[in-house]
Amino acid sequence: NIKIAANAIDSSLVSLKVEKPQLWDLENTNLYLAKVSVYDRKTLTDVYDVPFGFRTLKFTHNNGFLLNGKRVQLKGVCMHHDLGALGTAINKSAIERQINILKSFGTNAIRTSHNPPAPELLELADKMGILILDEVFDCWASGKNENDYAVHYSEWHKKDIEALVCRDRNHPSVIMWSLGNEVEEQYHPEKGVVAYLRDIVRLYDSTRPVTFGASYPSKSAINGTELQVDVHGMNYPSGVYGGPDFYETFLNYPGHEHLSGFASESSSTISSRGVYFPKGYQITSYDLKAPSWAS
């Protein structure tokens, strides 16, 4: 029991030991519940339930990603938060339907591109056995559009990182934090922005690795930017922007034996269902079209 005087603020650490916990993994999504009750003398005034799970994770140079000591190949997608015709308002049943469809063709991981996910997605990922790359920003101080997050970056980036990490850190499905996607600052490692943001994340969670999605990963690898994160996120590494041979050379370069990396975005396509009418009048649904950057 922790006693706090009225109108006071206190920070306390309580340690509990769980004997032989049932581990969380993709097949056995064992979850526990921490119940925090607030009393005013003997009157119950508030209850806060915190679901969580026990599991270990590690990214390795030679064996990739390890979940509870076992190698798991990440078969992921970058999924934006909108729900098609339903729009961006969250509908938990629709998210569950999305995850079921993704799992039906072998997906076991989701990158929340390119902003913080809805809490409902993480709740379902915990229960349904999906790994989450939790992404906080699409841009930093250097914006991509006239009225994007860069307008608010200076005032809000610390608060937003704290809010995201503190909100999501008890979800066993979350395996990595992503600082951003294809940010302009990746070309300027001397400014130290990546390391600066990484250290903010570590203030609130030091148990998970930090990454970001590099849009020109061969450049950010050469210039040292990717050495400022724990795991290298490589957008479209195969065939473009450096090619697969570059990454094998980079990850195995003397002194880089500790590094690990993953494809944070790849296999981009513009073929889909139906027939569309762009400037060329038609594009088929037979997977005949793809953008130049796609793997």
Please report, for each region that a protein language model flagged, where it lies by residue.
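Secreted/periplasmic carbohydrate-active enzymes, especially glycoside hydrolases
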Residues: 1-124, 128-132, 160, 166, ...
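Substrate-binding/catalytic cleft of secreted carbohydrate-active enzymes
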Residues: 99-102, 109-295
